[in-house]
Amino acid sequence: MEMSKASKQTTRHEESEHVQNPEPDQILSPRRSLELKQRKWWISVSLCLFLVLLGDSLVMLLLNFFYVQMKQDRREEYDQDLQYKGTWTQALIQNAAFPILIPLFFIFPKPKQHLETNNTSFLSLRLFFLYLSLGVLVAAHSKLFALGKLVSNYGIFSLISTTQLIFTAVLTAIINRFKFTRWIIISILLTIVIYVLGTPDFGGQPHDGEEFGYNIQAWLAFSATIAFSLSLCLIQLGFEKLQVKTKRYGNEKVFRMVLEMQICVAFVASVVCLVGLFASDEYKELKGDSKRFKKGETYYVLSLVGLALSWQVWAVGMIGLVHYVSGLFGDVVHMCASPFVALFVVLAFDFMDDVFSWPRIGALIGTVLALGSYFYTLHKRNKKKMAELNQSENNVEV
């Protein structure tokens, strides 16, 4: 009895201390708290946008470097089987560097858990199956993306890939109940035009006469775009309906949630790609590829490591945009990066007839308009929240 009374007194004492010492956000006025929250949100969105642009640029530069070094030996004589080799390796590289994110996951501060714990075990189980299904989906996209670029003309592949944004818009409207505004629709239309005009050249595409049939090219491109669009919508659904409701991070959106999503999904995708690598006996070609690499084995390893790290930079930025804004916005930013990537590719490589032409310059200008249209919508939403808060405060005063 005495022990139970003592424990009750201790619990009451802790609760009273919690009331007397509230969180910093609770000390601030609601208006000031919302201003700080929106400022942090804008900083997070800007950081993720920069990571996507940086990751896209590094990935395409390193992919071009890799295939330029491999192209002379692997493409001298057309061999249909050679078109498939290396695709499981490239798919694995897209996901395998996730362990570098684990230290960052523990470095970022973890907010206090919410006191409510109802149905958290059920939600955690659903979250586990979401990570599992997303990992398989990302692995499928990685394989199709790597294969589609090698067996088809990159111009055709990129042209079909413009439908990716349309698929994302349709799926997010169905799965995420996304509400469109006229400015978002304008941003989508501009982004499609930008992607068509500003697509960079790719050193791994086959020479004339090497392409597969157009039906295979189209199906590979469509499958890759649908898998990517669906993964964005499911990631957004996981953030909104599952990860937030587990209350492990309180009621706030924190960057730690982004890292958790990427680590878990990339782990599953890496396992799937690793199984594919060994099941297809593609791992036996790695030693031969390193010897055929014109710059030598050291540069071969460094290029693969650089690619793996660049893919993680891109993935963290992309999932961050999905987390803080939406999957549709993440796809818009990803596709708007194409003119910047094209500029870097032109400066770094000497491809035949590949120049930063006037259409690409127009696409670069259009990128500002497309992102500006979407950012205007985000600004209006934040402004509306502030106006609603002011109105509620005025009603309380009255």
Swiss-Prot record:
The modification Phosphoserine is found at S29. It is a multi-pass membrane protein. Pfam families: PUNUT. The keyword Transport applies. One of its GO terms (biological process) is purine nucleobase transport. Residues 11-20 have a biased composition (Basic and acidic residues). Keywords: Membrane, Phosphoprotein, Transmembrane, Transmembrane helix, Transport. GO terms for cellular component: membrane. One of its GO terms (molecular function) is purine nucleobase transmembrane transporter activity. InterPro entries: PUP_plant. Its main location: membrane. It is found in: Membrane. The chain crosses the membrane at residues 43-63, 88-108, 127-147, 155-175, 183-203, 219-239, 258-278, 301-321, 332-352, 355-375. Residues 1-26 are annotated as: Disordered. Belongs to the purine permeases (TC 2.A.7.14) family. This is Probable purine permease 17. It comes from Arabidopsis thaliana (Mouse-ear cress). The gene is PUP17.
